Amino acid sequence: MNYAYLNLDNIFLSLDELRSIIHGSEKEYYYGVALYEGDERVAYKSGAIKKTGKALAISTDVKDVVEALRGRCYSVDIDVPMREYKNYAKTVYGEVVSSIKTSKKCEKLDLIVTEGVIIAGERKAEKHTESILSHSKRPYSQSGTLNPEIGRIMVNLSESQREVYDPFVGTGTILIESRWLGLRCIGSDIDPVMITKSLANLRHFNYECEVFQADARNSPVRKVEALVTDPPYGRSFSPKGLKELYREFFYQATELVDGKLVFTTDFKFDWRDDLKSAGFKGVKIHTIYEHKSLSRAIYVVTK
């Protein structure tokens, strides 16, 4: 059994990203922690999961945990996602540390105390924050640009295993994250300036993607595994013009995508009825607060 320590600021989004990466569901869930079967290094490729590893002991009794770990050598970290267990966690930490050898040279041991349960596990992976930070430092960016962390989450939510197409490519966030994840990346934009900027950003990281100028409502792409994108929703469109753009794009998307459509928009818009009218059936929405003037909604849509 493996464990995933989730982002407490958006637990449901983290949990959904985990399910998408493992193409399945968690076996058990405690506040802030999911227990699952599959790849124990899931956190490395995630945008919202803090760390993952192999569970060694799961119990409400600290004695069980101590017996499972006794005599081993670890560098110990403790997490207490629920405040009411902080004092109990100190006791757990003390008993565990006194029964093992501790050294920073040894493997990381995560002790997580939540809902009265103690989860002890060997950490196998952490979120790759270095690449996320690196991808934020690119030649071209602009106001409202999707940040790499959200872009990575979106690509993972698509469950794509081969390719991703972004028909509103902008400065290339989705393509950059798709390529980092090892996927074939295709992008287009109606604005030639955005094509130039996205290509420059891709070259900056030595990433190769197929990028071309096209209207998202009439794309030359015929079929793609997953459609992941950040359509416009700013002041450049009137409310009527924006609604028409999205409606036409949704109808085009039903023809293009074999798997999932994942897109972001301002949370104040509700596109569920328009998506269903276009032929999509399943709609899941996650909200992410960014700053006082913008909260994004991530739509995960299936046919």
Model-derived regions, located:
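Class I S-adenosyl-L-methionine-dependent methyltransferase catalytic core
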Residues: 1-64, 102-108, 113-303
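A short N-terminal interaction module
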Residues: 68-118
